[in-house]
From Swiss-Prot:
Family as reported in the entry's similarity comment: Belongs to the DnaA family.
PROSITE patterns noted in UniProt: DNAA (PS01008)
Region Domain III, AAA+ region: start-end pairs: 127-345
Domain of life: Bacteria
Organism: Ehrlichia ruminantium (strain Gardel)
NCBIfam families the record matches: DnaA
Designated name of the protein: Chromosomal replication initiator protein DnaA
Length: 464
């Protein structure tokens, strides 16, 4: 039986290994590599495999549905163009998702992308995401320790004193899984003989229960205790599951005794894992505990810039800044917002601007909506122009202070229900006439000063 992410190839005719179409495809791959560069080709296009050609229709395969859909949106037109350059009878190119267990496959996809697991660990490991590598991980203050520790584990041929286990913890979507996949990919690509097993704690529990029911518990133990590196994601899942905790405890001890490396992740520190036995929490804290903190604006912007670069598309930096300042919950949601904007632009055929991004993400932004207060406006404007909040109340008339103050008054008038006297009072006891003057001054300048207009539009979106 195939899973939901697999499309069966039985109905597709497949060419012989040495067919002319295979030769054409190799040439097209070279052209795609040259056209898009290493980053995009390695991340997306290198995993495409040629399947068949029939009645002017070319069929390629991708290892996952996500990769298939991304290529269909962003790169299919260029692939079709190159095919038609070689064969004018080609009218379309389609992509299917294949199973790494299908006997008709022309290459072993397991060794390419979909599995990425070595040795006899295939039955216990989960697939690795080809996007999750060290090169694709943006490092900043919130995650630099976790990144350095993960990289060190990957580069070392044996467990490092003080880093076994490596315990990564942080909120949802902050990069824990990315780093665990990156460790595995680094080892795989370095042609190391080390055996790796990566899986979630939920899958560990499921396989343990299955082994108990089928009376294969010794095989289960052998599989997990024969690895060189065991990586268990979201270990908080075993909370309250006594028998699973018992087996995890013994597996942990067995691997440590054999001088094998463990990498564990959770959404909280070992000491905060409620429902997990004290002896397990103690062992999880034996090595290096590295937290991944909430992202900063600079880190979020860097993540977006790297993602856009790998997509091979141009998006105005103001749009990226808008996303980075408004989508703060986690990296997964941030990247999802960018994907939504890019997909909408590609499908509808519109350019990406602040207005279109705001419209496309209106639901997401509304979900994060907070009531706008005068204090919030003053703080945001001060932060935007790199001045002190106290400058909003001061009597200093320096242009670098007066203009942001006027902008804050303008936004206060537009975004709140406060009266002019109330607004004036919040800006150091100024009267309503001062507020009216500020509003009119900003409105006048916005007609002629495009940069000021853009800044105010961006602030407007950030505050809503």
């Amino acid at each position: 039986m195939n899973n939901d992410n697999t499309e069966v190839l039985e109905n597709y005719p497949q060419d012989g290994l040495q067919s002319n179409s295979h030769i054409i495809w190799k040439g097209i791959q070279s052209r795609l590599h040259k056209f898009y560069g290493n980053a995009i080709y390695d991340s997306w296009l290198s995993v495409l495999l040629y399947v068949s050609t029939e009645s002017g229709k070319v069929l390629l395969s991708a290892p996952t549905r996500f990769i298939k859909e991304w290529i269909l949106v962003h790169y299919l037109d260029q692939i079709l163009k190159y095919w038609q350059d070689e064969d004018q009878s080609i009218c379309s190119v389609d992509i299917c998702v294949v199973s790494n267990q299908d006997p008709n496959l022309l290459v072993d996809i397991k060794d390419r992308v979909d599995r990425g697991i070595k040795g006899n660990c295939d039955n216990v490991s989960s697939p690795l995401d080809p996007r999750f590598t060290f090169d694709n991980f943006v490092v900043g203050k919130p995650n630099e320790l976790a990144f350095a520790a993960a990289r060190r584990v990957a580069e070392s041929n044996s467990p490092i004193s003080g880093s076994n286990p490596l315990f990564l913890y942080g909120g949802v979507g902050l990069g824990k899984t990315h780093l665990m996949h990156a460790i595995a990919w680094y080892i795989i690509k370095s042609c190391s003989k080390r055996k790796i097993a990566y899986l979630s704690a939920e899958k560990f529990m499921y396989q343990y229960v299955t082994a108990l029911r089928s009376k294969d518990i010794m095989l289960f133990k052998e599989q997990f205790r024969s690895v060189d590196i065991l990586m268990v994601d979201d270990v908080q899942f075993i909370s309250g599951k006594d028998s699973t905790q018992e087996e995890f405890f013994h597996t942990f001890n067995a691997l440590i005794d054999q001088n094998k490396q463990l990498v564990i992740s959770a959404d909280r520190s070992p000491s905060d894992l409620d429902g997990v036995e004290e002896r397990i929490k103690s062992r999880l804290g034996w090595g290096l505990v590295a937290d991944i903190n909430e992202t900063t604006f600079e880190l979020r912007l860097g993540i977006l810039q790297l993602k856009v670069e790998k997509m091979g598309i141009n998006i105005p930096n103001k749009v990226l800044e808008f996303l980075a300042k408004n989508i703060k919950s986690n990296i997964r949601e941030l990247e999802g917002a960018l994907n939504k904007v890019v997909a909408h632009s590609s499908l509808v055929g519109c350019s990406i601007t602040l207005d279109t991004a705001s419209d496309i993400l209106s639901d997401l932004l509304r979900a994060n909506h907070k009531s706008v207060t005068l204090e919030c406006i003053q703080k945001k404007v001060a932060e935007f122009f790199n001045i002190k909040v106290s400058d909003m109340y001061s009597t200093r008339r320096l242009r670098t202070l007066a203009r942001p103050r006027q902008i804050a008054m303008y936004l206060s008038k537009k975004l709140t229900q406060k009266s002019l006297p109330e607004i004036g009072k919040s800006f150091g006891g100024r009267d309503h006439a001062t507020v009216i003057h500020a509003v009119k001054q900003i409105e006048k300048l916005m007609d002629t000063d495009s940069k000021l207009r853009d800044d105010i539009n961006l602030l407007n979106r950030m505050l809503r």
